[in-house]
């Protein structure tokens, strides 16, 4: 193609993504757009076409990004090339959203006509505004009996400040309003700007591992062009590769001779390691490199850690292989081997958030068939020692002695909760109970409120989301972002069995809630650990101070059964002998904690306040 042809093609490209809260109908709308532009034949079409993973279809959520090229014949007679980039809506994957938005010029904002604006919708809209995208509001699900499109239209104007007078009223399920949406994309979303002749700049917004071709990078070309045989360089790592093939997704991958400005597609270059194609990194040409990378790249740091151990210790190597494979596709997963006296060999893994953690666990159990035990999730604490050194602690058993600690800081998040008026009291009570600091409250309209709190991440990790949903009958929506570290009065609590510390059950807790939590755990263990021949104390301690205790009573053998009548001194001799034996047993006895007891303690919910 010469320069004129390239520019003419570039003016007909529209790159857009779809932003929505979970369950507002994003994947269904994507399906309708694919149908309307006849990207797929009727035979190939299935629901949630862009959600490839079984897990995504079951939970009805989008986890990995997908990008599709579509051709649409508009009413003005021209054929336009659309690139639809599907984004996840969940808060754990907000970095994925921000990268996919950076690859677009416009975004469809989908709002449910019955539910109105939710917390995650807002969070993603702000990301889109940060990336200077043209936002087109779409009010979806107008076929519902409870739909109130006019109220929602007003809400979009009041809460977000977008002009919603031209918002399309649509029902993705019934295919209403789809054509209007496509026409609006043609009219309102700007074509990509960028010099097709300039040095290559391409944004990596996702990558996956293919066992035949190595790493496949999903890219958006911002400037220049790329074709097979070209030498490319990653700007974050400085590594160089030779391109083997480029192409686009129509949802199926199709090879192309070159990708130019505005194209969204894939590139392979016999890259062996997903770590080399960091998401958000810029690809440039090795011979004619760009001066500076595209802005916005940052390394993702895990927020939540937990230990993963195979139930059957022989599965350790399989678990390592499973994690290696998942890491190929998921750059934000981190893991390192660790051992626990109680659970044997396993891995300490870092995740972006709780949903991310659950999904990884489920994928290991499903795709690799390994049964797992997971330890309680913990966050990264910053510990300042008396000698001035600062340590980052993600595992409670690595916490230094109390005498050496100057202060402990823990990560706080800013939580935005949207909730109907009736539940404001319940939500505020929950947040206060989780050591939340009240920041702000706004009434969005006569029946919905936005409440903002600062809450320690460790409290959210535990079971905040479940409690929020149950306290508000499922009506609250919730979004959080990390704001930094604050000092807290935190202590490490150990659980002792027969005087021995069980390392897998150590937790870091706030001093005020240590007694409650300790008492709960020892009571639970008392129920679940089988009785021994000798009595076993179960204790919770902070340092050397025991704060809670319960005792598993001994099983007793009746040694007097063989004395029919007879002298008291004879009986006493037998009882003394038994007592000696029990004492010796207790000194050398070892108490095994059964698997179920671990699972029960780690899954233990806090008492409802």
Curated annotation (Swiss-Prot):
Tell me how this protein sits in the membrane. Answer: Peripheral membrane protein
- Coarse class of the primary localization is membrane
Query: Which SUPFAM superfamilies does UniProt cross-reference here?
Result: EF-G C-terminal domain-like (SSF54980), P-loop containing nucleoside triphosphate hydrolases (SSF52540), Translation proteins (SSF50447)
Catalytically driven reaction(s): GTP + H2O = GDP + phosphate + H(+)
Cell inner membrane recorded as keyword = no
The reply to whether Transferase figures as a keyword in the UniProt entry is no
- Keywords carried by this UniProt record: Cell membrane, GTP-binding, Hydrolase, Membrane, Nucleotide-binding, Protein biosynthesis
Please state where this protein is localized.
Cell membrane
Pfam family membership, one: GTP_EFTU_D2
**A GO cellular component annotation in the UniProt record:** plasma membrane
Binding locations of GTP: 23-28, 140-143
The Gene Ontology terms for molecular function here are:
GTP binding; GTPase activity; ribosome binding; translation elongation factor activity
Domain of life of the native organism: Bacteria
One biological process GO term for this chain? positive regulation of translation
User: Family assignment?
Assistant: Belongs to the TRAFAC class translation factor GTPase superfamily. Classic translation factor GTPase family. LepA subfamily.
Q: What does this protein do?
A: Required for accurate and efficient protein synthesis under certain stress conditions. May act as a fidelity factor of the translation reaction, by catalyzing a one-codon backward translocation of tRNAs on improperly translocated ribosomes. Back-translocation proceeds from a post-translocation (POST) complex to a pre-translocation (PRE) complex, thus giving elongation factor G a second chance to translocate the tRNAs correctly. Binds to ribosomes in a GTP-dependent manner.
Which protein are we looking at?
Answer: Elongation factor 4
Gene (UniProt): lepA
């Amino acid at each position: 193609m010469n320069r004129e042809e390239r520019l003419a093609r570039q003016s007909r490209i529209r790159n857009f993504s779809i932003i929505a809260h979970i369950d507002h109908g994003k994947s269904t709308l994507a399906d309708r757009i694919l149908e309307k532009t006849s990207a797929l034949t009727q035979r190939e079409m299935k629901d949630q076409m862009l959600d490839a993973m079984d897990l995504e279809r079951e939970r009805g959520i989008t986890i990995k990004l997908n990008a599709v090229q579509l051709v649409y014949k508009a009413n003005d007679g021209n054929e336009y090339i659309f690139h639809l980039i599907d984004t996840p809506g969940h808060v754990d994957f907000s970095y994925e959203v921000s990268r996919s938005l950076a690859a677009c010029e416009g975004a469809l904002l989908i709002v449910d006509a019955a539910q109105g604006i939710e917390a995650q919708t807002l969070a993603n809209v702000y990301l889109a505004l940060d990336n200077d995208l043209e936002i087109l509001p779409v009010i979806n699900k107008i076929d519902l009996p409870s739909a109130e499109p006019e109220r929602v239209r007003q809400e979009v104007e009041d809460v977000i400040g977008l002009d919603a007078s031209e918002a399309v009223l649509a029902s993705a399920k019934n295919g209403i309003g789809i054509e209007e949406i496509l026409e609006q994309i043609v009219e309102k979303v700007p074509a990509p700007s960028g010099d097709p002749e300039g040095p290559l700049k391409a944004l990596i917004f996702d990558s996956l591992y293919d066992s035949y071709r190595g790493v496949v990078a999903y890219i958006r070309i911002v400037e220049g062009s790329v074709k097979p045989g070209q030498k490319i360089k990653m700007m974050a790592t400085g590594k160089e590769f030779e391109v083997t093939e480029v192409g686009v997704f129509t949802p199926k991958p199709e090879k192309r001779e070159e990708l130019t400005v505005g194209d969204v597609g894939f590139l392979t270059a016999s890259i062996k390691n997903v770590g080399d194609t960091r998401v958000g990194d810029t690809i440039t040409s090795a011979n004619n490199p760009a001066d500076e990378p595209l802005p916005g790249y940052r390394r993702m740091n895990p927020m939540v850690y937990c230990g993963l151990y195979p139930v059957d210790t022989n599965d350790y190597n399989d678990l390592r292989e499973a994690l290696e494979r998942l890491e190929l596709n998921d750059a934000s997963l981190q893991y390192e081997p660790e051992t626990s006296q109680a659970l044997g060999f396993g891995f300490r893994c870092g995740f972006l958030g709780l949903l991310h953690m659950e999904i990884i666990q489920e994928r290991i159990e499903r795709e690799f068939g390994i049964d797992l035990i997971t330890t309680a999730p913990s966050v990264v604490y910053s510990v300042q020692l008396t000698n001035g050194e600062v340590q980052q602690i993600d595992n409670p058993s690595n916490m230094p002695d109390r005498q050496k600690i100057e202060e402990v800081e823990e990560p706080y998040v800013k939580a935005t909760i949207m909730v109907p008026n009736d539940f404001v009291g319940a939500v505020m009570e929950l947040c206060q109970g989780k050591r939340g600091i009240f920041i702000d409250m706004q009434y969005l309209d006569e029946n919905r409120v936005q409440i903002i709190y600062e809450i320690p991440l460790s409290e959210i990790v535990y079971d905040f989301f479940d409690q929020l949903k149950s306290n508000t009958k499922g009506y609250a929506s919730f979004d959080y972002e990390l704001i930094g570290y604050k000092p807290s009065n935190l202590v490490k609590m150990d659980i002792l069995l027969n005087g021995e510390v069980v390392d897998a059950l150590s937790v870091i807790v706030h001093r005020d809630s240590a007694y409650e939590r300790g008492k709960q755990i020892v009571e639970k263990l008392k129920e679940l650990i089988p009785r021994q021949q000798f009595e076993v104390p179960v204790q919770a301690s902070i340092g050397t101070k025991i704060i809670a205790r319960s005792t598993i009573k001994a099983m007793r053998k009746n040694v007097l059964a063989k004395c029919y009548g007879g002298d008291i001194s004879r009986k006493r001799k037998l009882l003394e002998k038994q007592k000696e034996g029990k004492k010796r047993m207790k000194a050398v006895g070892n108490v095994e904690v059964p698997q179920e007891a671990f699972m029960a303690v780690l899954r233990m919910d806090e008492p409802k306040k």
